[in-house]
């Protein structure tokens, strides 16, 4: 596979994190994993040159219910519009600022499926942005750097377990579905890739916790990974009775389960409500 940044007459732009999927066997496997169904509301993030877009449109789109796509590169937008016409509704702009909820069906039931080969340089911020729209999402299937996927699905007590693990596992059921080697892309990235499936928990399955407080605690806990929690969470010892929670501070952040972090965040919310 050539290392050229040019593919189908388009130069991949580093600032957009562009690596175009070109392996048809991998493309077929990804589409089979997604399992698109005609008439579903689906949006693709970063369609690029349309490698996934074409088979998705063939399975899901109608003129009345097109596939949606969010694309930042205006050169690609023109090509995609010309190629797919009314079967693809393009939204020009940055996925980090896009209101994905605007594509959901009216009402509160999950109705939107989100897919994409996410730009690796913004993957974590984009995953956090997408959490905002989880209540209207059926599922998400993303191509990401393998290292990021490993962190997303990591178990407590492993080196890969991180702030990203806790915050996403609190909101989604996640599974690593496929490995994708660098030679599947043009130009080939310097890292291995993988497909992850993310299914939001239903409202009745979610713990009753303020995600802002949970994020505050988890960020503090992982701020210095090698230090014990009695140091990183020391500022909370005056407001939270860790002993009453059975929460051992003589551990590192990676050794604490998602449920335990949720329990501490709930305790913090109670103390702050009393203080008010």
UniProtKB/Swiss-Prot annotation:
Its EC number is 2.1.1.182. InterPro entries: KsgA/Erm, rRNA_Ade_diMease-like_C, rRNA_Ade_methylase_Trfase_N, rRNA_adenine_dimethylase, SAM-dependent_MTases_sf. It catalyses: adenosine(1518)/adenosine(1519) in 16S rRNA + 4 S-adenosyl-L-methionine = N(6)-dimethyladenosine(1518)/N(6)-dimethyladenosine(1519) in 16S rRNA + 4 S-adenosyl-L-homocysteine + 4 H(+). S-adenosyl-L-methionine binds at residues 19, 21, 46, 71, 94, 117. It comes from the Bacteria. It is found in: Cytoplasm. Belongs to the class I-like SAM-binding methyltransferase superfamily. rRNA adenine N(6)-methyltransferase family. RsmA subfamily. GO terms for molecular function: 16S rRNA (adenine(1518)-N(6)/adenine(1519)-N(6))-dimethyltransferase activity; RNA binding. It comes from Burkholderia vietnamiensis (strain G4 / LMG 22486) (Burkholderia cepacia (strain R1808)). Specifically dimethylates two adjacent adenosines (A1518 and A1519) in the loop of a conserved hairpin near the 3'-end of 16S rRNA in the 30S particle. May play a critical role in biogenesis of 30S subunits. This is Ribosomal RNA small subunit methyltransferase A. Its main location: cytoplasm. Keywords: Cytoplasm, Methyltransferase, RNA-binding, rRNA processing, S-adenosyl-L-methionine, Transferase. GO terms for cellular component: cytosol. SMART domains: rADc (SM00650). HAMAP family: 16SrRNA_methyltr_A.
